[in-house]
Amino acid sequence: NRTFKTNTKCHVKNQCNFLCQ
């Protein structure tokens, strides 16, 4: 799930951080 669009420092590898949603 690519929920991180502009959040580059909020994604971990290929996994999106739930804290950043």
Curated annotation (Swiss-Prot):
Location (main, coarse): secreted
Gene Ontology cellular component list: extracellular region
Protein name: Venom peptide Ocy4
Record localization: Secreted
Tissue and organ distribution: Expressed by the venom gland.
Keywords from the UniProt entry: Secreted
Protein's organism: Opisthacanthus cayaporum
